[in-house]
């Protein structure tokens, strides 16, 4: 069930923020593009469309070598993850 998978998924996205910060500091736009692509592809699968949208923003920014937008996407992902509260509802 997703309920069992979501905590690990979110841990991985938090790790991605750190990976992205290192890549950003190195100016590694290809790594940021690839990471953004991965984030974009996984977010919606877990019900986090906002994560997918942020991943898309990071992917596009890095593909266009737009460091300012890439940095903003990384910050947005970190803020989103820090503000996220998960509530499971029995149906």
Residue ranges and their predicted role:
Residues 1-38, 45, 64, 68-91:
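Long, amphipathic alpha-helical coiled-coil segments characteristic
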Residues 54-63:
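Hydrophobic, amphipathic alpha-helical faces that serve as interaction scaffolds
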